């Protein structure tokens, strides 16, 4: 048995992970999202615009016999293609045509995996994705742009088998004050600014 500890940040004190639930437009589609980084989970817990406190739930995942897709082991283009499957960086017809071709070329079939592991995305990285698809960003510096600052690694629970191997440690429940968000996470990130400035210089 191989166990890893993961955290889920949410405004909800009570959470029941359920197979088939979740938003299609999240980074890796429907699923239950967790991270090994407790600080990242705290950010998730209080990142909504409503001034409410949040919660970090602690889980243990038995990864024995689970098929895990780790995007860190693949080219960053495969990760971008996965994001494009679920989240639109632009609404233009040209972007939709180009992104479809990009997905066909670099995408990975994730349907057979129990868990997807990889970087999380934010607004600055979707800006870069949009510019890359438009051929405004050179491949040689794409990874450098995407490594500006720590994105954080997330796990997305996808299959019924993976859900069955996920157990909450209720004694590990942590309350997160909303003030933490104001002090630590709310300011415009340096990462976002640098990503934007660098892409503008290309």
Task: Describe the residue ranges of each PLM region.
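Conserved small/polar residues in nucleotide/adenosyl-binding loops
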Residues: 191-198
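A short beta-strand micro-motif
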Residues: 6-9, 57
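Active-site-proximal loop/hinge segments that shape catalytic or ion-binding/gating pockets
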Residues: 73-171
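Acidic, proline/serine/threonine- and glycine-rich low-complexity intrinsically disordered segments
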Residues: 187-189
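Short polar catalytic/cofactor-binding loops
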Residues: 9-15, 198
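Short His-Asn-centered micro-motif
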Residues: 8-10, 34-36
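ADP-ribosyltransferase catalytic core
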Residues: 2, 18-30, 36-97
